Design a protein with these regions (language model features):
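Membrane-embedded helix-loop-helix hairpins and adjacent transmembrane boundary segments
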Residues: 1-424
Length: 424
């Protein structure tokens, strides 16, 4: 919602950073290739590519390391996001009298993040794959109904003339020149600072790099996280391809009905929103503030339930990826091959808790949601791309080459933020 608010229709290109079109590559051939292996995890799949020699084992271990780092990054991202989101709906002034210790204003989102992450952790440990699937189905149904209602409300309360008067020239145009050319001066001056801090002013150069990087990331296949686990959990290679193909077709129209609806309502009625956090305007609070201000009674609860269900299912899928790799690919393979199932289950519980605690500690140092997202999609995935493109398409790449390529990429991703502060 924040991206649509600030960049208008040009924001449709920014998700290419992830990239959203990787589902095309998965649907056409990559999901089928992966599912035919009949393995349980992405790290285990690496051994089918490079064998069981020294290079194959090192490649296997480095994929596990990458998967765990990615899990920590995504959980820190979710921790910061859910904290800022819930701060809007549960005002600190109401909660603080019941908290037996002092929490500085700037750390209130972190307090909420810790609270809701703890609840989600118990859900992960008590639930299983079936609960995640049903939670996904339930939250999608809720969000579909909510998205249609919000889109209709936006159409009823925002006229084209009012939207045009509240936005800068070019906001409604998806196309662009060398520069972004969006000047919010005289409308909402603070948005200009947001554009500068995001670093998207030279939009053509940014777009070309984003497109090139997106094609490479898509060709590299899914990272060893819950996306790959869902592909490997499908019934057959055909269903794996169908699942990947239907994701964008089903999800995108519903998602953008709600995004665009809240964005235009927030722009036209901007003065009615409370975006202050710790004494400053935080544009990452646009979605919860717009929900609180514009969603009718009843619909607000429906949307909130759907978004929390989405957080819970995504959180559960992400957390479950860590014990899957560490228990199945490290402990069971190298430490205790004959371990009893009960012991493996208990170890999975322990690893799940440790992963959540570590990611929460990382999240305490994160200043914004966007900074974590940029590191994940630019830093960590940048280090992942080259080795994983070559593993599919260059038959001469061996396990040692893959291992060293991944290791250098991971180290570079970890060192880049502290060495080049402000770049990511």
């Amino acid at each position: 919602v924040t991206l649509c608010f600030v960049y208008g229709l040009k924001s449709i290109w920014i998700p290419w950073l992830w990239p959203v079109f990787n589902q095309i590559f998965l649907a056409v051939y990559l999901s089928t290739w992966l599912r035919r292996s009949n393995v349980l995890t992405g790290a285990e799949w690496i051994r089918t590519r490079f064998g069981d020699d020294r290079g194959g084992r090192l490649a296997h271990i480095v994929v596990v390391a990458f998967a765990v780092i990615a899990v920590l990054g995504f959980l820190a991202y979710g921790f910061v996001g859910v904290g800022k989101f819930m701060e809007i709906f549960i005002p600190w002034e109401v909660v603080s009298p019941y908290v037996p210790f002092n929490v500085p204003v700037e750390y209130v989102p972190h307090f909420y993040g810790i609270f809701f992450t703890s609840i989600a952790t118990f859900y992960v440990m008590l639930g299983g794959m079936l609960s995640i699937v049903w939670a996904d189905v339930l939250q999608f149904t809720i969000m579909t109904v909510s998205a249609v209602i919000i889109a209709v409300l936006a159409m009823m309360h925002v006229s084209p003339e009012a939207l045009q008067a509240a936005t800068p020239e070019g906001w409604a145009n998806p196309f662009f020149g060398w520069t972004l050319d969006l000047d919010w001066t005289g409308l909402i001056n603070e948005v200009n600072d947001k554009v500068v801090s995001d670093g998207y002013s030279l939009f053509s150069i940014f777009f070309m790099m984003m497109l090139f990087k997106g094609i490479l990331v898509s060709a590299a296949g899914p990272a060893p996280n819950y996306d790959m686990q869902k592909i490997l959990a499908t019934r057959s290679p055909r269903e794996a391809a169908l699942m990947s193909g239907f994701v964008s077709i089903v999800l995108m129209p519903i998602r953008y009905l709600m995004i665009a609806g809240f964005a235009v309502l927030a722009i036209v009625y901007y003065q009615e929103l409370d975006l202050m956090t710790g004494g400053r305007i935080d544009f990452e609070n646009i979605l919860p503030a717009a929900m609180l201000q514009f969603a009718p009674v009843g619909i607000l609860g429906l949307i909130l339930a759907g978004l929390l269900a989405a957080f819970m299912s995504t959180f559960a899928s992400t957390v479950n990826a860590a014990p899957a790799y560490l228990v199945n690919d490290i402990y069971k393979r190298y430490i205790e091959p004959d371990a009893e199932p009960r012991r493996l289950v208990r170890l999975s519980y322990l690893i799940s808790v440790l992963v959540v605690v570590i990611s929460t500690m990382i999240g305490l140092w994160v200043e914004s949601i966007n900074s974590v997202l940029q590191w994940l999609v630019s830093g960590l995935w940048g280090g992942y791309v080259v080795s994983n493109v070559l593993k599919w398409y260059w038959w001469r790449l061996n396990g040692m080459g893959y291992f060293w390529g991944m290791l250098v990429g991971i180290i570079g991703a970890l060192l880049f933020p502290p060495l080049f502060a402000g770049v990511i």
